[in-house]
Swiss-Prot record:
It comes from the Eukaryota. It holds the Pfam family Proteasome. The lineage of its organism: Eukaryota, Metazoa, Chordata, Craniata, Vertebrata. The gene is PSMA6. Component of the 20S core proteasome complex involved in the proteolytic degradation of most intracellular proteins. This complex plays numerous essential roles within the cell by associating with different regulatory particles. Associated with two 19S regulatory particles, forms the 26S proteasome and thus participates in the ATP-dependent degradation of ubiquitinated proteins. It comes from Homo sapiens (Human). Keywords: Acetylation, Cytoplasm, Glycoprotein, Nucleus, Phosphoprotein, Proteasome. The keyword Cytoplasm applies. The modification Phosphoserine is found at residues 17, 63-64. Belongs to the peptidase T1A family. The 26S proteasome consists of a 20S proteasome core and two 19S regulatory subunits. The 20S proteasome core is a barrel-shaped complex made of 28 subunits that are arranged in four stacked rings. The two outer rings are each formed by seven alpha subunits, and the two inner rings are formed by seven beta subunits. The proteolytic activity is exerted by three beta-subunits PSMB5, PSMB6 and PSMB7. Interacts with ALKBH4. One of its GO terms (molecular function) is NF-kappaB binding. It is found in: Cytoplasm; Nucleus. This is Proteasome subunit alpha type-6. InterPro entries: Ntn_hydrolases_N, Proteasome_alpha, Proteasome_alpha-type, Proteasome_asu_N, Proteasome_sua/b, Proteasome_subunit_alpha6.
Length: 246
C-alpha cells in the first residue's frame, strides 16, 4: 500500500490518514449535498432570514409535512441542509439542549451558545469510533438581546461561527461568492431587502424562477423576535416585488 493512498484510513473515523486527514468527516461534508438542496441565511440591520428550497420528491406526499425549517425555541429557528433523518435528530438534540439551558439558568439560551453546544456534540462524534458524524449542516437564526440579529452555522466537524450571510448545500460555493459581492456593497438591509437578497441569491445560483411553493422562508425581526415561517402568500408578495424590480 502506497503511503499516499487513502486505503484503510477511511474505515475508521478516529484514525488520521498519513496526510493528516479524517476521511469520514470529509465524507460527512459530501453527504450534506446528497439531499440536493441549497440553503441561504442573511442577516439584516434588524432581522435575520433563512431561505431554502422545498422539493417534494413524490406526487403523493402531503407537501405541508415536508420542511427543512425548524423552530428550536420560541425565538430561535434553524434551517437544516443534508440528510433529513440526521437533521431531525440534530434538531431534537438542539431542542433538548435549549430546554435544559432554560431549566438550569432560568433564561432562554442565546443563539451562539446553542450553536456552540451543538458543535461540541458534533465534535465528539468525530472522536469516538462507535459514533458516526451527522451528514447535515445547521444554520441558526435568532435575535440576541445584546448583539441584535444573529446567524450561526455549524458543520459535521464541530466547527461553528457567526456570519453576516452564509449558505450550505449543493451550490454553497456559488451562493457564498454571490453573497460576498452583495455584502461588500451594502450591509444595513431592511427586512424586505434582506428577504429579497436571500431569495435572489438562491434563484440566481440555481438559475430558476421560484414559485411560492418551491421555497421556504424563516424570519426573526427585532420588533418581533419570535421565529416564524412565512406563508406562501407572504413569499409570493416578495417574489412579485422582486419580479417588478427586474
Amino acid at each position: 500500500m502506497s503511503r499516499g493512498s487513502s486505503a484503510g484510513f477511511d474505515r475508521h473515523i478516529t484514525i488520521f490518514s498519513p496526510e493528516g486527514r479524517l476521511y469520514q468527516v470529509e465524507y460527512a461534508f459530501k453527504a450534506i449535498n446528497q439531499g440536493g438542496l441549497t440553503s441561504v441565511a442573511v442577516r439584516g440591520k434588524d432581522c435575520a432570514v433563512i431561505v431554502t428550497q422545498k422539493k417534494v420528491p413524490d406526487k403523493l406526499l402531503d407537501s405541508s409535512t415536508v420542511t427543512h425549517l425548524f423552530k428550536i425555541t420560541e425565538n430561535i429557528g434553524c434551517v437544516m441542509t443534508g440528510m433529513t433523518a440526521d437533521s431531525r435528530s440534530q434538531v431534537q438534540r438542539a431542542r433538548y439542549e435549549a430546554a435544559n439551558w432554560k431549566y438550569k439558568y432560568g433564561y432562554e439560551i442565546p443563539v451562539d451558545m446553542l450553536c456552540k453546544r451543538i458543535a461540541d456534540i458534533s465534535q465528539v462524534y468525530t472522536q469516538n469510533a462507535e459514533m458516526r458524524p451527522l451528514g447535515c449542516c445547521m444554520i441558526l437564526i435568532g435575535i440576541d438581546e445584546e448583539q441584535g440579529p444573529q446567524v450561526y452555522k455549524c458543520d459535521p466537524a464541530g466547527y461553528y461561527c457567526g456570519f453576516k450571510a452564509t449558505a450550505a448545500g449543493v451550490k454553497q460555493t456559488e451562493s457564498t461568492s454571490f453573497l460576498e459581492k452583495k455584502v461588500k456593497k451594502k450591509f444595513d438591509w431592511t427586512f424586505e431587502q434582506t428577504v429579497e437578497t436571500a431569495i435572489t441569491c438562491l434563484s440566481t445560483v440555481l438559475s430558476i424562477d421560484f414559485k411560492p411553493s418551491e421555497i421556504e422562508v424563516g424570519v426573526v425581526t427585532v420588533e418581533n423576535p419570535k421565529f416564524r415561517i412565512l406563508t406562501e402568500a407572504e413569499i409570493d408578495a416578495h417574489l412579485v416585488a422582486l419580479a417588478e424590480r427586474d
